A protein has these predicted regions:
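Nucleotide-sugar donor phosphate/pyrophosphate-binding loop at the beta->alpha transition
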Residues: 75-83, 111-143, 148, 156
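Short hydrophobic beta-strand element within catalytic cores of glycosyltransferases
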Residues: 276-278, 297-307, 317
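Carbohydrate-associated surface elements
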Residues: 153, 174
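Conserved acidic donor-binding segment of nucleotide-sugar-dependent glycosyltransferases
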Residues: 295, 319-320, 324-331, 340-346
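A short, well-ordered alpha-helix in the C-terminal region of glycosyltransferases
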Residues: 191, 340, 347-361
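Conserved donor-binding/catalytic core segment of Leloir-type glycosyltransferases
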Residues: 5-7, 148, 196-224, 230
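Nucleotide-activated donor-binding/catalytic signature segment of Leloir-type glycosyltransferases, i.e.
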Residues: 240-267
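Acidic donor-binding loop of glycosyltransferase active sites
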Residues: 254, 270-289, 303-304
Length: 380
């Protein structure tokens, strides 16, 4: 059976979403064929091999190889790693690869290795000098088996920027449904986490970077005096900044900062909530073409979702059907959406149930299987 070599573009392990997504995809691919994840070598990372499955709640095991690479200064470090990763994959005699890194994808395709490239953010990808050749050079076919974009908006952006349309495939992100089974009762989750039993709890999971709408959500608390906001994730610097913002608004006693928690523990926090908030703003750099991991986790948790309304969000969430979508960039719409689901149990239950049904189409295994079919993995 063919082995798939997955070339990550980020450090493994890391709490960043691109690390989580790479690990989950490798576990998804591993449902069908053997997988080896290739990542940049840093001594402190390679010593944490046993930490990966426990921290990230991976459904299946796969091999991991941290590849040493020449550090040619910050400007060329990425290219140095990409060359080292591609060389390693070639030395291993690979016939099938998947890459988040444009240079590696290009070099492997030039060498005749069947490879898929995963695209997440056009503006970042096209900064690589090789990007234009990767997406536009017809001589790379058939080795370059496809460019897999996480949203329809990104497919259109790539096509408009010159990518060959026949290479572009839609591949939204996914979720491990097994992590949400069996479901945990709200009261039990709150008891485990030490949360108040009788207070309305709204939860946000994920990073707390500026522009992610957390400031607007804190402002919304001033309009929701009975609500406790549970923030799961975030760096120490972001938490400090947002603590100050909460104090300035007088809501600091109704915000609980959990910081980074193991990925496998995230469902417990979602189950503890009465509502889940996804408050992206127009300042979010990736807002046009994103496919947020939290969106699928929220859907799987069976709690009502209040999300800001952007085209990429509407590819999965539908206002009044499986979520409430509200105008971005302000506290009042977020507060109004949360008020609706908190005050209307029938609405909250209906959109939650629909989201739980819809998310079954978005598992990592299904995503991996669709990609492998495009790549013709049986024939690589």
């Amino acid at each position: 059976m063919n082995k798939l070599f997955y070339i990550a573009r980020s450090r493994i392990p890391s709490p960043r979403a691109n690390c989580v997504q790479a690990l989950k995809m490798c576990a998804g691919f591993a449902a069908t064929l053997p997988v080896e994840l290739v990542a940049p070598y840093y001594p402190e990372d390679a010593r944490r091999r046993d930490f990966l499955r426990e921290q990230f709640a991976l459904a299946r095991a796969f091999d991991v190889r941290w590849v040493p690479f020449p550090h040619w200064g910050d400007r060329f470090a990425v290219r140095g790693y990409a060359l080292a990763a591609a060389a390693y994959v070639r030395i291993r005699g690979a016939r099938l690869a998947y890459s988040r890194e444009p240079w590696s994808a290009y070099w492997l395709a030039r060498a005749g290795v069947r490879v898929g490239f995963e695209a997440h953010f056009l503006e970042e990808d096209r900064r690589h000098p090789v990007w234009g050749r990767l997406v536009g050079d017809s001589s790379l076919s058939p080795a370059l088996g496809g460019i897999f974009c996480i949203s329809r908006s990104l497919v259109e952006d790539y096509a408009a920027a010159g990518a060959r349309r026949e290479l572009l495939h839609l591949a939204p992100d996914g979720v491990d449904l097994q992590r949400f089974e069996p479901a945990v009762e709200r009261a039990d989750a709150r008891k485990t986490l030490g949360l108040p039993a009788g207070q309305a709890v709204v939860c946000h999971s994920g990073h707390l970077y500026p522009g992610r709408g957390i400031e607007e959500t804190l402002d919304a608390l001033t309009l929701l005096p009975e609500v406790l906001l549970l923030l799961v994730g975030g760096t120490a610097d972001d938490i400090e900044r947002l603590r100050a913002h909460a104090a300035a608004r007088g809501v600091q006693d109704r915000v609980r900062f959990e910081g980074t928690v193991p990925n496998g523990k995230v469902p417990l926090y979602l189950y503890a909530a009465d509502a889940l908030v996804m408050p992206y703003t127009s300042r979010t750099p990736t807002v046009r073409a994103m496919s947020p991991l939290k969106m699928f986790e929220y859907m799987a948790a069976g709690r009502p979702i209040v999300a800001t309304d952007f085209p990429a969000v509407r590819e999965v969430l539908r206002d009044g059907e499986n979520a409430l979508l509200v105008a971005p960039d302000g506290a009042e719409p977020i507060a109004a959406g949360l008020r609706r689901v908190l005050d209307d149990p029938e609405l909250a239950g209906r959109i939650s149930r629909r989201a739980g049904l819809d998310v079954r189409e978005f598992t990592w295994e299904r995503r991996a299987d669709n990609i492998l079919k495009v790549l013709g993995a049986d024939h690589a």
